[in-house]
Amino acid sequence: MKEKIKHFSLLTVSTLIMAVGTYFFKFTNNFTFGGITGLAVLVADKTSISASDFSFIVNMLLLILGFIVLGKKFAVKTAYCSILLSVALSTLERVCPMDHPLTDQTMPELCFAIALPALGSAILFNIGSSSGGTDIIAMILKRYSSFDIGKALLVTDILITVAGCFVFDIQTGLYSFLGLTIRSFMIDNFIEGFNLSKYFNVVCDEPEAICDFLVHELNRSATVVHAQGAFSGKDKYIVFTVLSRPQAVRLRNYIKENQPSAFMLISNTSEIIGKGFHSI
């Protein structure tokens, strides 16, 4: 039960982060990158409907379409996040109406317009969910066609961003292109940061003490391989293990103090599949 509460708390917080970044920094500056919300900015400028209301209507229609086409297997988490994002944007518009940017500094506003939604999206992706929108279209296309979904969504985002250059001005369009480019990299970097672990290769003479520290102090396991020094010809042992960053600091300090002659190779990794980490 605690895990479910924690999970839905993460869903809620990450979606609200996206809503804040989108409403306060993206909509007010007419940045057009980012799928449905980008399209909403264009529609809001040419019609009487607000960007928040347009996002709400389109997301609800896509949600209904998702349930009809994808059936009961349609992700409950995605539905929850899609509804929450739409409601949050509409609520912010009514509680805190804004007709101009928070500041007159476009670049800092762009940074927040990119970073907050990217952070929220990264958290959602990391726990197996999304905020709906064009992701629902991608799910439907993936099920019923052989289209390259990633390229199709990228082309759509580019077209919406190009349209922003004509609807608004070149400067706003260029900022939107910059946002589109940085956003995908930032999401990937956030996800890698969430999953970052330290991979250890420790070449030593006495692996037993290191393994004992791993098992009893860090609650981790390891693999030990017999090896031989190329220059000395002496018997050596290699201890392989993967740890979180705090655990890595403790192991590194332990080895420095107790086996200073050991050789440590420590590298970053975010793709670890297996017991104790991500399931296959």
Role assignments for model-derived ranges:
Residues 1-206, 217:
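Core subunits and conserved enzymes of cellular information-processing
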Residues 46, 153-158, 162, 172, ...:
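Positively charged, small/polar-rich N-terminal and surface patches that mediate targeting and assembly
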